């Protein structure tokens, strides 16, 4: 990452800012009850780096409430690498907080963590939110939100913390039987670890972090949203990538997907038989035929998501099989099933229970297929999350019958268990997993904080429409607010074709953290973020083998702040971002 004081200045366009501002109308719906003020939030100053004081072993003596430091060791330069580049020398500190024995299941729980503190520190702290059901201590490198990263926060001098969110791998998914473990997974871990981590930083460097960031992908993006809403005055920058901040609803939607796919699967034990790769390619081509050129160039990407909603109709624009399925067409029932999946789950009264999804050719990606065909019925993902972690009361037998649990899930009765409570489980998953008020970002905004949200349009589990709906409401909530409209402190970027967190048919390699730092500390609002395809020879060493052969291996595109999209300028190499503009 190169920040502005290191000679990289992000392009700033007053025109685009004006366009973004005009999109939010007039009047104010802010719930801020303080005395109205025309004073804008302050511009935060850049972080100032310092060297570590003392040695790593000194940190073994760190004292904090209910915290145990179990090890503190020096990691020499090159112990870790990113994109074949050495990460500098740093202290690796491991420990845990709040060890206890559950009165419900008798298990011993604790919030395990590791912190990596650079010897040569840049003055910044990053809370790394991790994905899935947590339970593992993912190395605290600060790799957030992109395919094949070329750098990470630790490489660039951040102090980074990572945690297991209050349970270990052997307790997955049965930690859902313990009410406090549920809460720690939802929001307890980040709220407890944040002040501890800052105090450990002060011990290591003689000062608190100048700037604090929270970032993560998938469930880690949800953790970042929790930081934005519950801890907005403790963080200066939020990077929420592929965020599942309505995770209980999204997980239940996966069960609906499984039920729909079962209708057309030739083998219910292999849901990929419901829609083969050849058949997914038929659908992708139909989408591209109607929507590819809407952004000014036919390039295999659908940038104009909104226009495509009107231009493409799955009931009208997909070849229909006249007899048996042969991979060149879709049956009428397959089309109905896909229409239902992309509409999202409903109950018997027709009430929408999650969000729609846009049709995108990225559905040919194996990442998309894995979430739809495997995770929707598997023992490690959605059924166990719904049945053990999110519903009240939990049902531990789901581990043994996850497929049948998904197939038999009742969206009238079972879905209500996501918001249920009882004497043991006094907080529902709709409370502990989701932000308390997802539209109130006053604490973040009012002290000068900023937020970047990124999501792929072909995500196989968390709908980009769900995130977009939230952002549309945020635009309305802060419209014409004297303290700052939404685009002045929070921006949402869609990644066309990208599957869950990465992959798909997409330019999925980008550096949103640098963009966030330059916005927070230097006032340079991100009018675009350049994204690159990971074709042959990509310097990350992580090649996306599913990219079309007619793409340049280093194809680039600007990711645009919603509602703007990347449009071809009409001339120049269409493989290069420089020939596209956000309009």
Model regions and ranges:
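Bacterial N-terminal signal peptides that target proteins for export
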Residues: 2-14
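C-terminal motif of bacterial Sec signal peptides marking the signal peptidase cleavage site
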Residues: 21-25
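Catalytic-loop region of hydrolases
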Residues: 31-124, 136-140, 147-148, 284, ...
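Cap/lid segment of the alpha/beta-hydrolase catalytic domain
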Residues: 122, 130-206, 252-253, 403-433, ...
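Alpha/beta-hydrolase fold nucleophile elbow
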Residues: 207-218
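Gly/Ala-rich beta-loop-alpha elbow adjacent to hydrolase catalytic centers
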Residues: 216-220, 224, 459
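A catalytic-pocket lid/entrance helix-loop region that shapes and gates access to the active site
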Residues: 226-228, 233-348, 494
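Short beta-strand/loop motif that positions the catalytic acidic residue
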Residues: 453-455
């Amino acid at each position: 990452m190169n920040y502005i004081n290191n000679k990289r200045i992000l392009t700033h366009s007053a025109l685009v800012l004006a366009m973004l501002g005009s999109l939010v109308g007039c009047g104010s719906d802010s719930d801020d009850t303080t005395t109205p003020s025309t004073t804008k939030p302050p511009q935060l100053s850049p972080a100032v780096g310092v060297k570590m004081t003392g040695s790593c072993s000194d940190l073994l003596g760190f004292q904090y409430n209910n915290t145990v430091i179990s090890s503190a060791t020096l990691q020499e330069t090159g112990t870790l690498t990113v994109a074949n580049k050495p990460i500098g020398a740093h202290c690796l500190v491991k420990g845990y907080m709040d060890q206890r024995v559950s009165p419900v299941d008798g298990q011993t729980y604790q919030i395990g963590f590791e912190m990596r503190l650079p010897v040569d520190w840049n003055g910044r702290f990053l809370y790394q939110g991790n994905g899935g059901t947590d339970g593992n201590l993912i190395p605290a490198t600060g790799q957030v939100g992109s395919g094949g990263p070329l750098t990470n926060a630790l490489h660039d001098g951040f102090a980074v913390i990572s945690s297991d969110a209050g349970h270990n791998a052997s307790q997955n998914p049965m930690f859902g039987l313990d009410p406090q473990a549920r809460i720690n997974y939802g929001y307890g871990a980040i709220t407890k670890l944040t002040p501890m981590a800052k105090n450990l930083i002060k011990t290591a460097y003689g000062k608190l972090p100048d700037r604090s960031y929270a970032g993560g992908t998938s469930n880690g993006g949800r953790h970042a949203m929790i930081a934005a809403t519950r801890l907005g005055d403790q963080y200066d920058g939020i990077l929420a990538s592929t965020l599942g901040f309505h995770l209980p609803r999204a997980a239940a939607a996966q069960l609906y997907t499984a039920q729909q796919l079962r209708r057309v699967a030739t083998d219910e034990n292999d849901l990929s038989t419901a829609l083969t790769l050849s058949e997914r390619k038929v659908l992708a081509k139909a989408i591209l035929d109607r929507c590819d050129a809407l952004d000014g160039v036919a390039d295999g990407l659908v940038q104009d998501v909104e226009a495509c909603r009107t231009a493409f109709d799955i009931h009208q624009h997909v070849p229909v099989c006249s007899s048996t399925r042969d991979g060149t067409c879709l049956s009428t029932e397959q089309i109905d099933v896909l229409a239902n999946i992309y509409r999202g789950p409903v109950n018997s009264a027709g009430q929408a229970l999650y969000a729609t999804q846009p049709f995108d050719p990225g559905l040919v990606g194996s990442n998309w297929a894995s979430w739809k065909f495997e995770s929707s019925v598997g023992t490690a993902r959605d059924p166990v999350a719904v049945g053990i972690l999110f519903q009240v009361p939990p049902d531990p037998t789901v581990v043994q019958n996850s497929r049948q649990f998904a197939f038999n899930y009742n969206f009238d009765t079972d879905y209500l268990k996501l918001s249920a409570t009882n004497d043991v489980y006094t907080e529902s998953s709709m409370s502990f997993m989701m932000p308390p008020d997802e539209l109130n970002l006053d604490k973040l905004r009012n002290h000068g904080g900023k937020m970047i949200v990124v999501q792929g349009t072909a995500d196989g589990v968390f709908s980009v429409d769900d995130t977009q709906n939230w952002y549309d409401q945020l635009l309305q909530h802060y419209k014409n607010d004297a303290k700052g409209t939404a685009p002045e402190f929070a921006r949402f970027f869609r990644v066309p074709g990208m599957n869950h967190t990465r992959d798909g048919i997409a330019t999925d390699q980008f550096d949103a953290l640098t963009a966030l730092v330059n916005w927070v500390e230097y006032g340079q609002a991100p009018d675009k973020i350049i994204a690159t395809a990971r074709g042959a020879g990509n310097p990350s060493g992580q090649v996306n083998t599913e990219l079309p052969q007619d793409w340049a291996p280093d194809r680039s595109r600007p990711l645009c702040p919603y509602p703007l999209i990347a449009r071809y300028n009409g001339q120049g190499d269409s493989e290069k971002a420089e020939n596209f503009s956000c309009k």
